[in-house]
Amino acid sequence: MSVPTHQQDLIALLEERGFVHQCTDRDGLAAHLAAGPATAYLGFDATADSLHVGHLQGLMLMRWLQKAGHRPLLLIGGATTRIGDPSFRDSSRPILTEAQIQANIDGIARVFSRYVELHDDSLVNNAEWLDGVGYLEFLDRVGRHFSINRLLTFDAIRQRLDREHSLSFLEFGYTLLQAYDFVELSRRRGCTLQLGGADQWANIINGVELSRRQGGAQLFGLTMPLLATSDGRKMGKSAQGAVWLNAERLAPFDFWQFWRNCDDRDVGRFLALFSELPMDEVRRLGALQGAELNEAKVVLANAATALAHGEHAARSAADAARGVFADGTRDSGLPVMKLSRARLAQGLSLTDLLLEHAIQPSRSAVRRLAAGGGLRLDGTPVSDPDAPLAGEVDGLRLSLGKKQHLHLRLED
């Protein structure tokens, strides 16, 4: 892969790959990035202990920036999580405890570190400055620079009010807090670029404008398109729920399958965004038709899984998919999982089997499934999944919950 340097027009590369929706000053930002290493930040409120594939576009964008020599900052909204961003939401978020927020911060940082190299000062919590600022001080320092009339014109707020949904003053003030975050990161860390989804445009330009009004540095904003699949589903969701980026919430095998099963129309676009393949290869794979397009889907699944979970997990998931699905199915229509007699003789347990095929993320996950009655062999609940498989298992149906069923097949 050809890795750009900060002397090149990085914006053109990002546009070609589909990362750019809007820039506050496209030419100015391109020149700024070409002039030398810049510091960019991506912010998340700590509302969950992981990120999902809906966040992946931002992580990949930050990865490209770091490869080009720029410095990434991960801003966790330890303070703003208590409020909640009202952007394009119909209701308020639940209030979390401090312990929940800290656990979520730790989980998000672990996911983020798989995509960019984090240093000791790469992780920032906005509680660092927001917890210490008084209300009157904040109004004087920040509030004087904002017009209520203008805030009411922003889509995120206007649409909420147009639908006659309640918007608390707490949430209304969120955009001022995010603007203040940008200015504080500029002052404290020399940060000049904020990244975000298209729904963050108003919050980002408020930060750019606040810095200008306060006589601070010139700041830039770049937003990414809000992604949806070609069949209209919001990116980050599947029929089974959120597609999480950590193995504790979603097994690498299921993560791999999400990409392998994507709509044919999405393959080229997803390869550009979620792999690091050169664009010539992306275009070649995206142009494949019919059965050949499955090759491109496997490439996509391998690339996305390797970034999220490592090369070993990607290979294991791909091998499991070949073993489970490539052979076709028996009369029942269920996919087949193969296991060797030699491995069975060594004391193979169901836990071992599910981990080796990357179908469950951990031993504890298998045990929880069994404890809840969700792990069954031919309809009989398995109480001890760690026990060696005994008796004749060839042809038995292995069930994981209500929706996932496999046939076991012994091979020499």
From Swiss-Prot:
Keyword Nucleotide-binding: yes
Principal subcellular localisation of the protein: cytoplasm
A biological process from GO: tyrosyl-tRNA aminoacylation
Localization annotation: Cytoplasm
UniProt motif ('KMSKS' region) ranges: 234-238
Residues that coordinate or bind ATP: K237
Motif ('HIGH' region): 46-55
Catalytic activities: tRNA(Tyr) + L-tyrosine + ATP = L-tyrosyl-tRNA(Tyr) + AMP + diphosphate + H(+)
EC number(s) given by UniProt: 6.1.1.1
Residues holding L-tyrosine: Y41, Y174, Q178
Domain S4 RNA-binding: 348-411
Keyword set, alphabetical order: Aminoacyl-tRNA synthetase, ATP-binding, Cytoplasm, Ligase, Nucleotide-binding, Protein biosynthesis, RNA-binding
Any one GO CC term of the record: cytosol
A GO MF term: ATP binding
Residue pairs linked by disulfide bridges in the UniProt entry: none
InterPro entries per record: aa-tRNA-synth_Ic, Rossmann-like_a/b/a_fold, S4_RNA-bd_sf, Tyr-tRNA-ligase, Tyr-tRNA-ligase_bac-type, Tyr-tRNA-ligase_bac_1
Family per similarity comment: Belongs to the class-I aminoacyl-tRNA synthetase family. TyrS type 1 subfamily.
Alphabetized HAMAP family for the sequence: Tyr_tRNA_synth_type1 (MF_02006)
Reported function: Catalyzes the attachment of tyrosine to tRNA(Tyr) in a two-step reaction: tyrosine is first activated by ATP to form Tyr-AMP and then transferred to the acceptor end of tRNA(Tyr).
Subunit and interaction comment: Homodimer.
Protein known as: Tyrosine--tRNA ligase
Gene it is expressed from: tyrS
